[in-house]
Structure formats: C-alpha cells, structure tokens
Amino acid sequence: MSLTIKEIKEKLSRIETLEELHKHEANNDSRKGVINAIKSREKNILKQQALEEHYLSMNQYENNIMSSNRDALICGIDEVGRGPLAGPVVACAVILEKNHHYIGLDDSKKVSPKNRARLNQNLKENVYQYAYGIASSVEIDELNIYRATQLAMLRAINQLDVTPTHLLIDAMTLDIDIPQTSIIKGDAKSVSIAAASIMAKEYRDQYMRQLSKQFPEYGFDKNAGYGTKQHLKAIDQVGIINEHRQSFEPIKSMMK
C-alpha cells in the first residue's frame, strides 16, 4: 500500500540536502500532490542553503580577527533611532559566543518582525555578553544626532561586564582606547553588528510601545517616532512632549 501524500510530506520534511531529496523514492510517484511536495521541499532547502551561505559570509570580519587572536572578544555595535522625530537613539553592544549559529541573522531592517523577535530572544539567551546604551531626545538636541549616537554606543560598551578586545561598528568611529573597525553597511556584512542591530531595534520598539501607552495620540506603537501623517497631525493638534526632538524638522519650524 502506497503512502498518503501527507505521510510523504512528513518524510520529505526531514530531508536536509538536495542530493538526498533527488534520490528519494517519492520522485517515482506521479501524483500531483507528491510532485508539488518535492518542489516545495526543494525550494525550502535552497532557501536554507542561501541563509547558511549568507551567514558564513557575514563572519569574514570576525574570522580575520580570530585568525590572529583566538581569544579575541569581538564586540558588534549598532544603533537604532537616528531618524525619528521622537524617542531616544538606542545602541547595543554584543559579544557572541565562539561557536555561534544564528541562521537568518541580518540587518534588522531586512528581517520580518516575527523573525526579529525570535532572533532577539535567541540572542538574549545565548550570547556571551550584551548591553544597551541610550541617548535621550534632550541629549540629541544638545549634542546633535551623530554625537548622541556615539554617546549611546559608548554607554553600551561601558555597560558590558567585560572589556572587548576589538570593536566592529556600523559606519562610525568611537573615541575609546579599543581597536575598532568601522564598516559601511556593517549590519549586513558582520554577524556581530547584525546581532546588535536586531537587539537595539527590539529594545527601542518596546520602549516606544510603552511610551505609546502614555501618549496614544502620537501612534508611537506603530510609527516608532517617525514623522508619519498621524504623528505630525497629533503634534499640530496637541503639541510636543519631552520625548520629541526639537532640533529636528519639521518640529523645529513648528516651534517658532
């Protein structure tokens, strides 16, 4: 008696390589449901392989450092929140375990909210060290966004329980006595920076959701402080709060 299509799908789901899939006896089954199941599994295997290859490519900076110092404590640093009209800029500093394996890790802007939340939880439970640094909207107005971002990053590093031996930073340099590499679009090129990007994004989004409970009219839970139509309308109707950046346009002009 032949297996049902459901049973064949279950067997196919355990196959991890294209070679194994192409050799499977299900390829001799002419039923349309089985043919579609094989195609679907092939697509999923190819997708997983692409994720694995991308993950390996994102380890190049870490591997170069580790090749000369196997005991290096490599810290990835990234920030979230430079562009919004409200809320802090949040940085995260992350030191991954040596044998890390977080498939799907990428620039937080490229990861779906569901996968970002899953990765964030996995990272928080398994990384060697992580810490956050925040620069408030007041500090952003006083310093400018670039310097406030540097401040948030330095605060994150200083919150770690260990001192990193090398910093991998997304497109910035920091005034700190630790060897560092600044990488343009680093959150898409370094697994350590990508981890920091994910964790900073999740932390800031949660902060803005909490802020939205106090000030629901601005829609912070949906816009994260960016200048959406709803947000700008609320500013025009009820004014600003301390979390708004008064040095940012159009708020700066609206305050005159």
Swiss-Prot record:
Q: How is the cofactor bound?
A: Manganese or magnesium. Binds 1 divalent metal ion per monomer in the absence of substrate. May bind a second metal ion after substrate binding.
Annotated EC: 3.1.26.4
Enzyme class, first EC level, given as a word:
hydrolase
Question: Where, by residue number, does a divalent metal cation bind?
Answer: 78-79, 170
Catalytic activity of the protein: Endonucleolytic cleavage to 5'-phosphomonoester
Where does the record place a coiled coil?
none
Q: What is its main location?
A: cytoplasm
Which cellular component terms (GO) are annotated to the entry? cytoplasm; ribonuclease H2 complex
The UniProt keywords, alphabetically, are:
Cytoplasm, Endonuclease, Hydrolase, Manganese, Metal-binding, Nuclease
Which PROSITE patterns does the protein's record reference?
RNASE_H_2
Which parts of the sequence belong to the RNase H type-2 domain? 72-256
**Keyword Membrane listed:** no
Q: Which CDD domains match?
A: RNase_HII_bacteria_HII_like (cd07182)
Q: Which GO terms describe its molecular function?
A: manganese ion binding; RNA binding; RNA-DNA hybrid ribonuclease activity
Biological process (GO) annotations held by this record are: DNA replication, removal of RNA primer; mismatch repair
User: Which cofactors are reported in the record for this sequence?
Assistant: Mn(2+); Mg(2+)
Extract the Pfam families matched here.
RNase_HII
Please state where this protein is localized.
Cytoplasm
HAMAP family attached to this UniProt entry: RNase_HII_B (MF_00052_B)
Which PANTHER family does its entry note? RIBONUCLEASE H2 SUBUNIT A (PTHR10954), RIBONUCLEASE HII (PTHR10954:SF18)
The UniProt similarity line reads: Belongs to the RNase HII family.
Query: What does it do?
Result: Endonuclease that specifically degrades the RNA of RNA-DNA hybrids.
- From the Swiss-Prot or TrEMBL record, give the protein name: Ribonuclease HII
The record lists the organism as: Staphylococcus epidermidis (strain ATCC 35984 / DSM 28319 / BCRC 17069 / CCUG 31568 / BM 3577 / RP62A)
